Amino acid sequence: MTLKMFLPVNLVSVCMKLNNSVVMVGLYYGFISAFSIGSSYLFLLRPRFLNDDPDAIEKKASETAGFFTGQLLIFISILYGPLHLALGRPHTILLLLAPYFFFHFLSSNSGQYPSQRFAFPLLTKSMRNRSFQLVFLHSLLFQLFSLSVLGRPMLTRLSYIYIFRSNNKMLFVLSSFVGWLIGHILVLKWAGLVFVWLLKFIRSKTMKYITCNVLIPATKYIIEKWRNSFVAGLIREILAMKQVESALVRIKNSRLLDDVRWWIRGSGLISGLKINIRFYARLILRGFENVYVGAKFRQDMEHLFSIILFAFFLLYLDRTPLLYADPADKKLQLQRKLSNETQAAREEKELEERLTEKFEAQRRAQRAAQRKALQEFKQGVVESYLANQAAKDENQIQAQKDEKQIQAEKKATIRAEQVVQYTFGLIEAQRREMEIEAARAMQEAYKGMLAAEEEDVEEGVQEKQEGFPEEPISPSEEREENPKLLILKEKISILTEKISILTEKNDLFSFEIPIITSLFDPQKPLRPLRYIKTCAGVEKAVKNEMSQYFFYPCRSDGKQRLCFTYPPSLATFWEMIQRKMASRFPRIYTKAKWRALRGSAPGSYRQWISRNKKKKNSLSTEFQNRIQTLDQKKSLLNVLARRKRSSLQNVLETRKRLCNYKTKKEYLPEIADPFLTGALRGKSDPEVYDGVRKTSEIKVVFLKNNITMATLGNKNDDDLREEKNAISLLSRMKNPVNKLHLLFVNERDYPFVKPLVNRINGPAVPKKKKTISKSKQNEIKSKQKKVKSKQKKVKSKQKKVKSKQKKVKSKQNEIKSKQNEIKSKQKKVKRKQNEIKSKLNEVKRKQNEIYPKGVKFNATPKTEINPHGIRFDAATIEKYSFATGYSYRPPSFHDIIFKAFVTEPQRNKKKVIELEEEINKQVPRWSYQLIDELEQLEGAEGETQFSDHEIRILPFKRVSVFTEKEAKKKPLIDEEGNYVRHKKTYAVRFLGHMSDFRRGLIKGS
């Protein structure tokens, strides 16, 4: 039995199981994450250099302990959300980084500058006594910094992602931690071996391979100098090298390249650069040697590590977003606001011009129509006066008077409505402002009264206590008993509520920008590597705000999982909604409710599994039942012989079909239906189709299987039912859409279907043809013709009678409708009169409330302004009133917009103007505008002046295009006639023949 385990097949299966297990995956990811070496490893590698230090072993132990505790905290933060947020927020990073750098600076530079102000003797002594604790803190804090500030390696992030994807999280975490431990032990051992080999190599060579022709005087003095101020000297030398390099580049790209080349060769710039580079290399290798030779250079090595750490920070912080808001972004926002305001003002002016033009055109048309109407009216009056001068009926005069009265009332109602619409808005706005001011003033007055009353109460209590020392009374009890104070407090609370209601806005979804985001913007995207201009006319590059790899939890397969490409804007919006709804409705939207919605509740996954199991069981049982029913009922004859209701209608699955949602009976034809496939797809009978026709002669038959329609006449219900069933069954038997339709037969159809089935399944017996004489056939045909002719005559008479009846009914309906219209118009006029009276009364009442008695309110001033901004002078009003005969009131905003554009929909459908607002999206762009060296030179020669260039390009040379002779031949002359000097035109010639991969790169990226 034991030998069977070592068979190759079993070994392969065991290996496959181990590879697919969570433990092996965790070990693999943990082992990989150990090799992602970052800046935090520098503290582990530093004591390996300092073996001669007496406290080296203790420092190693403290640094490894801090390293492992930091990693443990990071592992805990993966599974514990608040800790992860605390370590990842910029506020906590700032609180950790600022004091860390300050104390690190004091501790490292305490003995180097004894005469300067950076030396704090009390602090330095306490720090030196606690050196091991400081080493522990250094290594621990660097692990926490590497989570957010320093670059997080990709290999460690893979393990974090897999935790969310795995089912057994604890097993994976434990196994990955074990793998990480094994990997770190191997890395440390390997580093120790490498350093021992380096030591042997350096001792064997003893720096013989570094030689220099130029003598460096007083090397010991230089080393002592660097020991005292190593960092400052190195920074100075780096800056000097940069200055030399920039000077060389400028000289190289200048126009006097040939003249200055001899100076570069003769000068000692290049040799000086070589000496500096050799000196730095020699200094570093001398440090490696002196660590093991003597203890003098130990401090220099510590300074070297601090320089490397500083370089790491500069590297990582250059690519991270700024912790404060960019002032250029604020300028851009102000510019956008100003541009939007100017665009809105232009659009408003254009709208006003269009509206004024249309209003003037309407006014001209109205004047022309009025002139024509006046001329026609005069002619009609003269003719009627001459024709009917003798005989005048009192009824006609009264009717004319009634019409004039109705028109006058209509005009009066229109005028009053316009007055009310214009004045009511102004009055209401003024009333609201006056109410707010009055409420605030009353609130301040009540507060002053309340303070005075409280002082009086305190004085009275003191007097009572002096007069009656046996029964002391507290001021709080006196305040509670005093009714004046209670009344004042109630009034102040009512006024505060009133002010809040008047100045209230929809605060449910108004997400205000907090103060912290102005200082810290963690969602601000990083600076790009290359500066790519998308369009020729666009000045600034487009900003990619949508992150391609944003991780956020989402629901998948009934479980909360990690989504790799979740939109960050949606995630922040969801979190803001949670906060707002939880603050507004804390009882309804609890934590359990949000977890259930997101799918992270503890019992949600079990519920999902149980639901899926139930669905699976129900589907399997249904499938088994269908197979059993199909096996039992093998043929249609057995079903019909038993005379039992067929259950095969529920055996086959009814498919979804497209229909009209209003009637739910109008289905698409089977050819055009995308849901139907298989045998039904592409086969249809013109006589058999689904549809609805709402006529008197055609009726539709709908069965359970969406069967067909048949044309029937006006008959009884019982006859109709029988004929419907017969026709539907015949159509299915003759022209079946699918053979399975033959199985769907009800019990009530059995007597009709039985003879058909017997004919189909019975023996084929030849039938004798009945012979009829020709004379009888002719007689039958003649009788049929006579019957048809009589039927036609009867039908024609019936149609004539029906048409006459319809005409009579239509006339009666017209008379009734006219009577009803007259009554409704009279009622509407009365209602409008009552409404206008009530509105005018309200306006007068509000005027009396707001304005004092001495002030008068003019509802119709001489110069009036519409809500849309059009001004009407008194001259235009007088002209219009003289032409029309009644006083003019300028139309409202509603009348100008809607009455000008709305037309009759039946006649002029194409002339209707649709006012549509264009939805514009502002493309996010970078706040800065980067330029290259060529653009910088062009701007320096022209009017625009740019700052220093920040984009790399190929080395180029400017070549002049024209000569002085050509300029003299073709002189330039201004508009005034003065001669103008020719501007020099240059052509750019790029010197790099090879492909330059640095082209388009941003400096510092």
Curated annotation (Swiss-Prot):
Pfam families: Ycf1. It comes from the Eukaryota. Residues 783-810 have a biased composition (Basic residues). Its main location: plastid. Residues 811-824 have a biased composition (Basic and acidic residues). InterPro entries: TIC214. It is a multi-pass membrane protein. Residues 457-481, 767-833 are annotated as: Disordered. Belongs to the TIC214 family. Involved in protein precursor import into chloroplasts. May be part of an intermediate translocation complex acting as a protein-conducting channel at the inner envelope. The chain crosses the membrane at residues 25-45, 67-87, 91-111, 131-151, 177-197, 304-324. One of its GO terms (biological process) is protein transport. Keywords: Chloroplast, Membrane, Plastid, Plastid inner membrane, Protein transport, Transmembrane, Transmembrane helix, Transport. Part of the Tic complex. PANTHER family: CENTROSOMAL PROTEIN 2, OS04G0158400 PROTEIN. This is Protein TIC 214. It is found in: Plastid, Chloroplast inner membrane. One of its GO terms (cellular component) is chloroplast inner membrane.
